Amino acid sequence: TDIVVPREIDGGTVIDCNSFYNHYEIKSLRVKAAYSGWRVYSTQSYEEDYQGSRVSGCTNLEYYEMAEDTTSLNKWKLEGCNSLKTIVIPKGMKEIFASTFSRCKKPEKVIFKKFSNLENITGVKKLPWWRKQHTKKNGMVIYKNCLIDTGKREGTLIIRGNKIKKIMGNAFANSKAETIKVTGAPKLCMWTFDDCNAKKIILGKKINVIPYRCFGSNDTLKEIHILSKGEIIWGLDSYGNYQGLDMYTPKSQNLDIYVYSDKFHTESVKKWRCDERVTVHVPKKVMAKYRKYTNCKVVAL
């Protein structure tokens, strides 16, 4: 059975989110309807609602084109899809988590409607055939000018932004480099440096936007250098909101951040969530402002 669900009929959503649960007869499903808010479109009570997956139990589903408003994909959303061959990733997708294909048959084909909108595809890069297909001679996984994985590079790792347009989430998770330097102006993402083993991260003069949770969680990180002399936007999320600098570091770990710009973006700096374990080295001109809006130790460059 091949089912195509239109976006709407007479301005209303066509189906509720439980419509395909345990429908083993479906082989192909193309969903155009928009119903991202699970409870908003469910016709069942909260107790009866199966919140894990819209297609859970579709054991014969081979082709699945997801609804355009789907923003993330995890193992629960494909649970039990044991015949899956092709999955179409919609334009609105932001994150495909590491465990995405752990509870279903691993697809043989992944189609991206707009790859440039994605920020994390850890689940896809764990597919052996996909990783092999896009691994370069230097061991890096690169697709459509986006750096997906740096491989197990050691020493000093330099990423040149003239060739790389975006650095995805968890791109350095397998890297053994102690120093990471990013030049040019590639776009960074949430979790770009998460789980890296670096002691020092250096961001080049053309990088002015530090996405929300860009540095993620790191047990070894000692220094961050922001070389830009322009206004730095801290913690910009995918919805355009300012979340400030949010670092996950062990309680015993101290971190030094060197900011070379004497320009100050108040709206994003006042959202910083770092404490006195973080020492910020800034130009004298903006020391007072950093002391006013953050809980960090502030010293002059």
Segments (PLM) and residue ranges:
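Terminal, low-complexity interaction segments
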Residues: 289-293
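Structural signature of tandem-repeat unit edges
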Residues: 1-14, 23-49, 57-72, 81-95, ...
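A structural signal for leucine-rich repeat
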Residues: 55-56, 78-79, 101, 215-216, ...
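Short secondary-structure transition/capping segments
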Residues: 121-125, 191-193, 213-215, 236-237
